[in-house]
C-alpha cells in the first residue's frame, strides 16, 4: 500500500495523491536520487495485481511512452515493480488537464485554440512516426503546464486490444465522446482515428462544448457515425470558415475524406486564419454512401411520364410481325391511359396550385426579442416565428457580451409579413475589453512595451512583484494575472499583475562568523564560494595596526538575498603609520595621562582588532603610552 511520506521503491518519497483512474492511482513524489526532483508516480491498483490483461496494458503504456521523447509528450524516467505493484515514473507537470482549462476558459480565442491543437498534433506526429496510435485522445489526457505548454499523456490503450471494441460490460476502449465512427463500429483504430479525436477536441476548444452527447455510450457512439457535426460558426461566430473546415475534414465520417496524416492537418490549421482564406466556402462531403437521399425539388418534373428505368434494348429486337399484330390494341389502350393520366395531372396541378396559394398567403407576425441570446438561439427563435434569418452583422458593444445578440433589424416587436428576412447584429464585445496574451517567459520590459503599444495600457495599470527564481532569468515574467485568454477591461479599475523573476538569489555571508572577524582575502573566498562573481574590494586607511587587513563593512548588508551577479563591495582596513607631527601630539597627550590610567589601558588590550577607523589615533596613542 502506498503511504504518504514514505519512500516507495527505495527511491521515491510520496508527497500526496494527485489523481485516480480506472486502473491506477497517480502520486506526486520526490526522486531522492536526483536532488528531490518532483515526479509523478503512476501505480497500478492492488486489485489488478493478478490481472494479466491489466498488467499488460499498464506495461504497454510504459513501453509506448518510453519510445517517445518530445516536448509535448509527458516524459517517462522509470518503470518497474515494487512489492507486487506495477509502477511508472513520469515527469511532474505542474498545471491542469486540458478539460479543466476548457471549462475555465472556453470558448478559446482562435489563435490560442490553434496553438494548443498544433502542439497536440506535433506530439502525435512523433507517436505516429513510431507506429504508435493513441486510441484515447481527449482533453482529460492532455495536460497544460503552468507555463502554458501542452503535453499528451496516458498511452494506456495505445496499440492495445485492436481486435476488440466492446467488452462484456458494453464499455468501449477510448472515451465515447471522442471515439471515431470506425472505432464505434468495432473496426481497428488508425492514424485517422486519432485525427478524428483531435478534430473533436478542436471543436470543444472553439465552442466550449462537445458535438455529440446522449443518455448512454451506445447512443453517443451512434451519433458519431450517423449525425453531421454541428456548425461551429453558429455556436461561435468569431471562428472563420477555414478553421471550421479543418474540424469538418478531421471529423469526416469516411476515413478517405479525413487528413491522411497529422502533418497535413498541421499545415491546414496553420493557414486557417490567414487573409487569403477569408472567403473560403464551407466544406461539404458527398453523403451518397449508406444513406437515403432525397432528390432536390427542382430536379423533379411532375409532367414527365417517362419510366424511371429504360427498357433494355433487347425488347426492341422483336419482329415486325409481332409488333404489327398488336398495334391497334395498343393504340386503344394508350388513348385510355393517356386520358386517365391527363385527368390526374390536371387534378394535381389545380389542387397543388390551390394548396400553394393557401400556404403562401402571408400572415402578419411579430419579430421576437433575441437580445442577449446566442446566435444559434436567436436563429431558432426567428425561424420558429416563421421568419427567415437574413445577414449576420458584427458590431462592438459596451453592454452586450461578446458572441451575444445586440439587436435585430427590423427591431423586436415589429409586425412584418411571415417569411420576411431579419438581420441579426452580434456583439464583438467592448473594444476596451481585450483577451490577455501569454506573457510568461517574456522580459518585463518587452511585455510593458507590448501592452502600451497594442492596448494603451501604461505602468499605472500594472503591478509587478519581484520573486526569486532558479528557473527564470532576472527580469523574466514567471506568472501573470489575468491568465492567457482571459478578459481584461483596459478602462476598468482592475490591474494586471506580473510576478517577475529577480533571478537566482544568494544571501550575503557574515564577515565575522562566531564573532571572529575575517581578513578581506578570507571573506573574498567565502563570497566566491557562495556564488558571487562581482566583488569589489574597498581598502580604507587606519592607524590601528591590529585592524590591518580585516573586513569591517560589506554592501549589500550581511544576510541580504541578492542576485549573485550583483556587485558586492567589501570594505577593509589597511594600516598606515601615523606622521611625525601626529606622533608628537600623541606623546604629549600621553604624558598628561596618569600612570594608573596607562596601566589600565594597557591591560585592557584585546585580541580582536578594532575596526573603528575614527578612533585610530586614540588607540595608537594608548599603545605608545603603554610602551
From Swiss-Prot:
GO molecular function: ATP binding; protein serine kinase activity; protein serine/threonine kinase activity
Domain Protein kinase: 12-275
Catalytic activity: L-seryl-[protein] + ATP = O-phospho-L-seryl-[protein] + ADP + H(+); L-threonyl-[protein] + ATP = O-phospho-L-threonyl-[protein] + ADP + H(+)
Biased composition (Low complexity): 579-627
Keywords: ATP-binding, Kinase, Nucleotide-binding, Repeat, Serine/threonine-protein kinase, Transferase
Family: Belongs to the protein kinase superfamily. Ser/Thr protein kinase family.
Protein known as: Probable serine/threonine-protein kinase PknB
Annotated organism of origin: Lactococcus lactis subsp. lactis (strain IL1403)
Amino acid at each position: 500500500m502506498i503511504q504518504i511520506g514514505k519512500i516507495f521503491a527505495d527511491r521515491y518519497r510520496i508527497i500526496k495523491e494527485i489523481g485516480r483512474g480506472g486502473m491506477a492511482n497517480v502520486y506526486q513524489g520526490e526522486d531522492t536520487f536526483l536532488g528531490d526532483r518532483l515526479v509523478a508516480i503512476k501505480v497500478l491498483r492492488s486489485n489488478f495485481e493478478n490481472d494479466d490483461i491489466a498488467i499488460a496494458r499498464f506495461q504497454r503504456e510504459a513501453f509506448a511512452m518510453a519510445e517517445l521523447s518530445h516536448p509535448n509528450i509527458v516524459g517517462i524516467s522509470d518503470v518497474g515493480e515494487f512489492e507486487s505493484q506495477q509502477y511508472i515514473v513520469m515527469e511532474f507537470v505542474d498545471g491542469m488537464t486540458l478539460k479543466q482549462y476548457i471549462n475555465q476558459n472556453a470558448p478559446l480565442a482562435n489563435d490560442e485554440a490553434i496553438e494548443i491543437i498544433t502542439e497536440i498534433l506535433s506530439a502525435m506526429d512523433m507517436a505516429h512516426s513510431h507506429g504508435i496510435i493513441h486510441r484515447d485522445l481527449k482533453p482529460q489526457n492532455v495536460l497544460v503546464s503552468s507555463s502554458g505548454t501542452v503535453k499528451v499523456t496516458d498511452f494506456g490503450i495505445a496499440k492495445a486490444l485492436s481486435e476488440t471494441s466492446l467488452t462484456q460490460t458494453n464499455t468501449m476502449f477510448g472515451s465515447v465522446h471522442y471515439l471515431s465512427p470506425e472505432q464505434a463500429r468495432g473496426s481497428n483504430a488508425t492514424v485517422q482515428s486519432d485525427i478524428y479525436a483531435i478534430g473533436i477536441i478542436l471543436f470543444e476548444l472553439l465552442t466550449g462544448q462537445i458535438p455529440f452527447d446522449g443518455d448512454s455510450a451506445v447512443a453517443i457512439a451512434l451519433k458519431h457515425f450517423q449525425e453531421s457535426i454541428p456548425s461551429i460558426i453558429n455556436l461561435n461566430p468569431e471562428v472563420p470558415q477555414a478553421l471550421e473546415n479543418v474540424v469538418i475534414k478531421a471529423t469526416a465520417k469516411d476515413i478517405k475524406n479525413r487528413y491522411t496524416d497529422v502533418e497535413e492537418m498541421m499545415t491546414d490549421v496553420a493557414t486557417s486564419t490567414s487573409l487569403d482564406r477569408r472567403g473560403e466556402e464551407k466544406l461539404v462531403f458527398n453523403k451518397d454512401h449508406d444513406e437515403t437521399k432525397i432528390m432536390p425539388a427542382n430536379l423533379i418534373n411532375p409532367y414527365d411520364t417517362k419510366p424511371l428505368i429504360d427498357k433494355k434494348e433487347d425488347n426492341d429486337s422483336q419482329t415486325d410481325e409481332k409488333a404489327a399484330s398488336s398495334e391497334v390494341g395498343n393504340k386503344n389502350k394508350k388513348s385510355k391511359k393517356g386520358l386517365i393520366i391527363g385527368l390526374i395531372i390536371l387534378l394535381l396541378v389545380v389542387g397543388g396550385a390551390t394548396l400553394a396559394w393557401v400556404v403562401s398567403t402571408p400572415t402578419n407576425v411579430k419579430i421576437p426579442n433575441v437580445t442577449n441570446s446566442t446566435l444559434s438561439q436567436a436563429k431558432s427563435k426567428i425561424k420558429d416565428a416563421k421568419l427567415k434569418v437574413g445577414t449576420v452583422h458584427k458590431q462592438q458593444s459596451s453592454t452586450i457580451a461578446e458572441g451575444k445578440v445586440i439587436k435585430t433589424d427590423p427591431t423586436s416587436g415589429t409586425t412584418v409579413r411571415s417569411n420576411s428576412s431579419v438581420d441579426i447584429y452580434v456583439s464583438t464585445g467592448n473594444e476596451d475589453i481585450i483577451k490577455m496574451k501569454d506573457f510568461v517567459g517574456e522580459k518585463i520590459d518587452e511585455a510593458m512595451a507590448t501592452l502600451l503599444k497594442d492596448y494603451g495600457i501604461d505602468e499605472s495599470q500594472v503591478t509587478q512583484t519581484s520573486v526569486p527564481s532558479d528557473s527564470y532569468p532576472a527580469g523574466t515574467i514567471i506568472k501573470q494575472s489575468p491568465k492567457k485568454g482571459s478578459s481584461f477591461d483596459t478602462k476598468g479599475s482592475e490591474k494586471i499583475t506580473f510576478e517577475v523573476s529577480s533571478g537566482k538569489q544568494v544571501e550575503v555571508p557574515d564577515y565575522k562568523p562566531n564573532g571572529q572577524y575575517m581578513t578581506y582575502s578570507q571573506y573574498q573566498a567565502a563570497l566566491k564560494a557562495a556564488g558571487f562573481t562581482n566583488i569589489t574590494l574597498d581598502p580604507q586607511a587606519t592607524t590601528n595596526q591590529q585592524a590591518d587587513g580585516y573586513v569591517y563593512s560589506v554592501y549589500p548588508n550581511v544576510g541580504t538575498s541578492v542576485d549573485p551577479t550583483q556587485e558586492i563591495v567589501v570594505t577593509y582596513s589597511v594600516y598606515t603609520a601615523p606622521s611625525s607631527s601626529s606622533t608628537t601630539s600623541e606623546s604629549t597627550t600621553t604624558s598628561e595621562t596618569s600612570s594608573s590610567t596607562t596601566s589600565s589601558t594597557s591591560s585592557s588590550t584585546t585580541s580582536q582588532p578594532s575596526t573603528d577607523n575614527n578612533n585610530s589615533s586614540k588607540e595608537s596613542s594608548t599603545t605608545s603610552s603603554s610602551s
